[in-house]
Swiss-Prot record:
Its EC number is 3.5.2.7. Keywords: Cytoplasm, Histidine metabolism, Hydrolase, Iron, Metal-binding, Zinc. NCBIfam families: hutI. It is an enzyme of class 3 (hydrolase). N-formimidoyl-L-glutamate binds at Y150, N324, G326. It catalyses: 4-imidazolone-5-propanoate + H2O = N-formimidoyl-L-glutamate. This is Imidazolonepropionase. InterPro entries: Amidohydro-rel (IPR006680), HutI (IPR005920), Metal-dep_hydrolase_composite (IPR011059), Metal_Hydrolase (IPR032466). Fe(3+) binds at H78, H80, H248, D322.
């Protein structure tokens, strides 16, 4: 099956095969081809170029993209798409003045979702989660990471991870799985959090690894949740089981989470709303990808990740949604890209790089996804007729996506 897209107004994120991420000042550059064509063979990108120099090609299907822009699908490297129910009451509570911490102390927050998840069948959790996955795919997401973390018992955590596995089996986009048993301390362990860490490390983690249910390990390294000591313990144990770290750090406080992530060669450190100079220095020269989650900052009215500080230090940066029922009930990467420009002062070029090639890197996918590169998977989207790619983040409330292709097939 061959698909030819012609008369493309601008083809974005055109890269050579050896580019796996972009950092600092490199992120200001977004390689493009104007008045372009793109050839897909089966599920991969076969060739591309300018219309002026297009050879004679016989394709099974041809699409005229006059006035439209083509770019890789978004790579969302941090989500909690698998959950049950919603938490709209807490949304109202926050409007009425309660903080994230106060809601958690009243039995809301993560523990609210935990109870709902535990009480919901695996089949129902799958059905609810599949709807969300289909929704974000229609919005242009072509690769996604999904975490557990609303189970907090062996049975419920394994249930979540099996749902993630089923989503991966039933949908064509890459679905990466992360074990986040250390998301919050269950009520029954409130007075003995070390015992809960023992459960996660000694009981649940070995079963997750044995069943091959996760590629990554995560922990909410934050005051009131899990300490630096806890993080060291868990990441050390996970390494023995072959799970790479991708961890929550610096959402509300800088307590050394970035440093411990780097020490354990984390693939990514995520959130980073609170960053000091030491955190920036620790990341220099490492392979760890900083990941910002601006729609979480929007929803919770908390600071935004200091993107300019990160990029001016010549570090890379990825963008993701943090899609979850409590702090970001949205998986819209288009909004994330807009917020990065509006609230984090990233240029459109920087934001698109962060949401494509760098997002792919933060999931170990940039060799196969995240750019228009010969031989990569044909995960791309075609916009509606728009004046330029800057219109994507500029028109923040408009759905400018016309069609989305995963593995060369229209979804």
């Amino acid at each position: 099956m061959t698909l030819l897209v012609t008369n493309i107004k601008e083809l974005l994120q055109v890269r050579e095969q050896n580019i796996l991420k972009v950092s600092g000042s490199e992120m200001k550059e977004l390689p493009t081809i104007k008045n372009a064509w793109l050839l897909i063979e089966n599920d991969k990108i076969a060739d591309f170029g300018t219309m002026k120099n297009m050879p004679k090609i016989t394709a099974d299907q041809t699409i005229d993209a006059t006035g439209k822009i083509v770019l890789p699908t978004w790579c969302d490297s941090h989500t909690h798409i698998v959950y049950a129910g919603n938490r709209e009451q807490e949304f109202a509570d926050r409007i009425n003045g309660l903080s994230y911490e106060e809601i958690a102390n009243r039995g809301g927050g993560i523990l609210n979702s935990v109870k709902t998840l535990q009480d919901t069948s695996e089949e129902e959790v799958y059905e609810q989660s599949a709807k969300r996955l289909k929704e974000v795919m229609k919005l242009g997401t072509g690769a996604v990471e999904i975490k557990s973390g609303y189970g907090l018992t062996e049975k419920a955590e394994l249930k979540m991870l099996r749902v993630i596995k089923k989503l991966r089996e039933n949908y064509d986009l890459p679905v990466k799985s992360t074990f986040l048993g250390a998301h919050a301390i269950p009520k029954e362990y409130k007075n003995d959090p070390d015992a809960y860490m023992d459960l996660v490390i000694n009981e649940i983690l070995p079963k997750v690894a044995k069943e091959g249910l996760a590629e990554y390990i995560d922990i909410f390294c934050e005051k009131g949740y899990f300490s630096i000591k806890d993080t060291h313990r868990l990441l050390s144990a996970a390494k023995e089981h072959g799970l790479k770290p991708k961890i929550h750090v610096n959402q509300f406080n800088s307590i050394g989470g970035v440093k411990v992530g780097v020490e354990h060669e984390a693939l990514s450190v995520d959130h980073l709303e609170v960053m000091n100079d030491e955190d920036i220095e620790v990341l220099k020269g490492t392979r760890t990808m900083p990941v910002a989650l601006p729609s979480c900052s929007l929803f919770l009215s908390i600071p935004y990740t200091p993107a300019r500080k990160i990029l001016d230090a010549e570090l890379p940066l990825a963008l993701a949604t943090d899609f979850n029922p409590g702090s970001t009930p949205s998986g819209n990467m288009n909004l994330v890209v807009s917020l990065a420009c509006i609230k984090m002062k990233m240029t459109p070029e920087e934001a698109i790089n962060a949401a494509t090639i760098n997002g792919a890197y933060a999931m170990d996918l940039s060799e196969t996804h995240g750019s228009i590169t010969k031989g990569k998977m044909a995960n791309f989207m075609i916009t509606k007729e728009i004046p330029s790619f800057t219109f994507l983040p500029y028109a923040f409330g408009t759905n400018s996506i016309d069609s989305v292709y995963i593995n060369g097939k229209l979804i």
